[in-house]
Amino acid sequence: MAAAVAGMLRGGLLPQAGRLPTHQFIRYGSKAVTRHRRVMHFERQKLMAVTEYIAPKPVVNPRCLPPPPSPPQEETGLIRLLRREIAAVFRDNRMIAVCQNVAMSAEDKLLMRHQLRKHKILMKVFPNQILKPFLEDSKYQNLLPLFVGHNLLLVSEEPKVKEMVRILKSVPFLPLLGGCIDDTILSRQGFINYSKLPSLALAQGELVGGLTLLTARTHSLLQHHPLQLTALLDQYARQQHEGDPVVPASAQPDPPNPVQDS
């Protein structure tokens, strides 16, 4: 009996193995605030300040050091193709104009390209990374200062400067920087002055007219003195003919006066 009561008490008060307790204590109250960082102890702060790592200063400023050599870039097929195209553009065209490639809409660029193509003027765009090395090794190296930023080329087999300047005036946000005509470097003002020159046919006509006028004047100058001499001789002959007395054919001329002896 006593053993049974002890078993009941033990079963009701002490949990058996493998079973959860019938009563659990749950804590209801404020939790610990962990959002704030705990302040470091003053002694530890001094220790951390003393043992802080101080990196040595470099002897030479890194900005003064030369940049590391860049790895050589492999020449792809596209780069070789662009180089051949650039060489053909500078070899086959007499007029090469350099313009600043500003932000233009696709419609405006297409319209301007169409207007230039009417006069056989082509628009070419090449990357400066390929264009500048070509110019450095060619006779066009004085054009290098023009290639800053984004540029485009206006090329033609014949110097159509007047038509190009007229079209560029209608597009004020596409500035003309300079270029070359027949291997002669011109500035922007040089292109404008070149466009004001007369056409080749008109210049040839003026030259032929000037040469004809000079030839006619030379001919008149060469004929002036002989004609003047002939007129003077003719006038002299008439004066001599009018001054001679009229002598009849049957009459004898008067004898000369005898010379008196002294």
Swiss-Prot record:
Q: Where in the cell is it found?
A: Mitochondrion
The GO biological-process annotations, alphabetized, read as: translation
Where in this protein does the record put region Disordered?
A: 240-262
Q: Name one GO cellular component term.
A: mitochondrial large ribosomal subunit
> Keyword set for this entry?
Mitochondrion, Ribonucleoprotein, Ribosomal protein, Transit peptide
Residue spans of biased composition, Pro residues class: 253-262
Does the record bear Ribonucleoprotein in its keywords?
A: yes
GO MF: structural constituent of ribosome
Which residue interval is the transit peptide? 1-28
Q: SUPFAM superfamilies of this UniProt entry?
A: Ribosomal protein L10-like
Task: List the Gene3D superfamilies.
Answer: 3.30.70.1730
**Family stated for the protein in its record:** Belongs to the universal ribosomal protein uL10 family.
Q: How does it assemble?
A: Component of the mitochondrial ribosome large subunit (39S) which comprises a 16S rRNA and about 50 distinct proteins.
**Protein known as:** Large ribosomal subunit protein uL10m
Q: Which organism is it from?
A: Bos taurus
